[in-house]
Amino acid sequence: MGNPVVIKAKKDYDCVFEPEPMSWLRLQYYRYQVTAGTYLFTYKEAFVFNTVVFIIVFLTGWAAKSIIVKLLPSLWRLSTLIPSFFASFFMSLLGKDASSQ
């Protein structure tokens, strides 16, 4: 048997595999248009639809941020208690008194 033949893509087709950032952005916008059907809208309808989508995404992010900010102190306190709980738990399994350590 001979050596395997390796076929490399031409330079013209490299952008298909590794698109430039702007091409990638255009591709994502095209996918959004096709998925949501906004390519059928007029410019005004598309503007209103995109504005509503933007507001919904913004408000969802805002709500998630406010929930995370409220939960963060209690999660931080919980994360500081977990190691001491496991330390005392494993010490009790080993039969050692955790208070003497």
Swiss-Prot record:
The chain crosses the membrane at residues 52-72, 75-95. Keywords: Endoplasmic reticulum, Membrane, Transmembrane, Transmembrane helix. The keyword rRNA processing does not apply. The keyword Membrane applies. InterPro entries: Ser_palmitoyltrfase_ssu-like. Pfam families: SPT_ssu-like (PF11779). It is a multi-pass membrane protein. GO terms for cellular component: cytoplasm; endoplasmic reticulum; endoplasmic reticulum membrane; serine palmitoyltransferase complex. GO terms for molecular function: enzyme activator activity. GO terms for biological process: sphingolipid biosynthetic process. Its main location: endoplasmic reticulum. It is found in: Endoplasmic reticulum membrane. This is Uncharacterized membrane protein C23A1.05.
